[in-house]
């Protein structure tokens, strides 16, 4: 756009006055501009410094502290402001580091407790295995054919019961008495310990005269069962080849012979037998075993 010159009439007497007014007006406007510019710069500096301080607080949580340069050095020099030295204000230690240290200690304590528990349990199992090995060595191998804990403990129980039976069967020999002549043995003193040997027999001989002989049992029979093992006590009259026939009958009943003890007193004989009930056997209870043995003893005595 072309500039056009505009000519104003001038008062010959007011030229100096107008020039003076223009000069004062120009100085006043320049002072207002400088003041406004200074105020704007101060506000801008305060806003930038607050933004820098907020950024520093956020960065303190995740990174190390370093010296930051002054963002607006020229403006700070003009306004007489100084830069904030970050190194003069060391940051406080953050709680997250302490928490991590405490968590590491807790993990170490938990790991130590776990290792201690494992060591105690290992020692307990080792001691239990040693005791089971000693217990298994004290009894015949037929009582504990398997090496597990239940078999060893069950076999030990059966072996202790068998030893008790053997001890009771040896009592008649210890308490044997003789008549005054010394050549004969009292029959009553020998039979008495045999009768005391049976606690709860399933079959018993009838001594009363009013009971028919056919209804009485030919032997005293008592059976006890522990799991798959059975302890049998039989007291009867001695017969030839009776023991061989009894063992054969036990095998036919699927009763495996584990231990046998025989005690004789004059015309009587006491069998202490330990057997194992095999799988597939029809004898599942003490009454079944006692009934089968009663029939076997009756048949043996009738054959002889």
From Swiss-Prot:
Keyword annotations: DNA-binding, Nucleus, Transcription, Transcription regulation
Tissues expressing the protein: Expressed constitutively in roots, leaves, stems, and flowers.
Biased segments, Basic residues type: 92-104
Superkingdom: Eukaryota
Subcellular location: Nucleus
Residue ranges of the region described as Disordered: 86-107
Keyword Plastid: no
GO MF: DNA binding; DNA-binding transcription factor activity; protein dimerization activity
Gene Ontology BP annotations: regulation of DNA-templated transcription
GO cellular component: nucleus
Residues annotated as domain bHLH: 112-163
Coiled-coil stretches: none
Assembly, per entry: Homodimer.
Protein name: Transcription factor bHLH94
Native organism taxonomy: Eukaryota, Viridiplantae, Streptophyta, Embryophyta, Tracheophyta
């Amino acid at each position: 756009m072309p500039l056009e010159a505009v000519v104003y009439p001038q008062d010959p007497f007011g030229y100096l006055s107008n020039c003076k007014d223009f000069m004062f007006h120009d100085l006043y406007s320049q002072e207002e501009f400088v003041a406004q510019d200074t105020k704007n710069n101060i506000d801008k500096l305060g806003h930038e410094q607050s933004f820098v301080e907020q950024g520093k607080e956020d960065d303190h949580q995740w990174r190390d502290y370093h010296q930051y340069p002054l963002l607006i050095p020229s403006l700070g020099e003009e306004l007489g402001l100084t830069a904030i030295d970050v190194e003069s204000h060391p940051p406080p230690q953050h709680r997250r580091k302490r928490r991590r240290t405490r968590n590491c200690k807790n993990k170490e304590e938990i790991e130590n407790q776990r290792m201690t528990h494992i060591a105690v349990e290992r020692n307990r199992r080792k001691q239990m295995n040693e005791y089971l090995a000693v217990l298994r060595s004290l009894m015949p191998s037929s009582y504990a054919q398997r090496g597990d804990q239940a078999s060893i403990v069950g076999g030990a129980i059966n072996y202790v019961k068998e030893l008790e039976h053997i001890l009771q069967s040896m009592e008649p020999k210890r308490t044997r008495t003789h008549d005054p002549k010394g050549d004969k043995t009292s029959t009553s003193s020998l039979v008495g310990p045999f009768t005391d040997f049976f606690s709860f027999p399933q079959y018993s001989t009838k001594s009363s005269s009013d009971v028919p002989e056919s209804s009485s049992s030919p032997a005293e029979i008592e059976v006890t069962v522990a799991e798959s093992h059975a302890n049998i006590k039989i007291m009867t009259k001695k017969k030839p080849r009776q023991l061989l026939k009894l063992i054969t009958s036990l095998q036919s009943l699927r009763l495996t012979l584990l231990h046998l003890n025989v005690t004789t007193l004059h015309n009587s004989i006491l069998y202490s037998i330990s057997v194992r009930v095999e799988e597939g056997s029809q004898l599942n209870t003490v009454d079944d075993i006692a009934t089968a043995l009663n029939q076997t003893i009756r048949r043996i005595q009738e054959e002889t």
